[in-house]
Amino acid sequence: MSLDDRLAAPRAMAPEMCSLNMGTMNFALYPAAARITEWRHDWEKPFLEGSDDLVFKNTPRDIARILQDLGAERSARFEFECYDIGHLEMLRHFADRGLVAPPFFIQFVFGVLG
């Protein structure tokens, strides 16, 4: 999915607040496939099993564009999702550049392979 595709809904809906992952990462959910015995939908198992090759792209350029497009231009506030220490450093980087200012709403997400 392109960045424009990802931005289409928040551009149309103009939320007051939205989530922003602070970096590119793997969402390696495949270990769950071995633990689940009943599936509700036929896409669930292949999706989980295939997550060992899934990358969620959110580069510094992507993040800067999101901050500009939704934040500066549409006044959205962000809930910054940080999955590791590097994501906190990325947030500091954008604060140092003046693209985002405190107070920060930070969601620490731990326990995801990635």
Regions found by a protein language model. Give the residues of each.
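Catalytic alpha/beta core domains of metabolic enzymes, predominantly
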Residues: M17-G114
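Catalytic cores of alpha/beta
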Residues: S2-M13, G86-H93
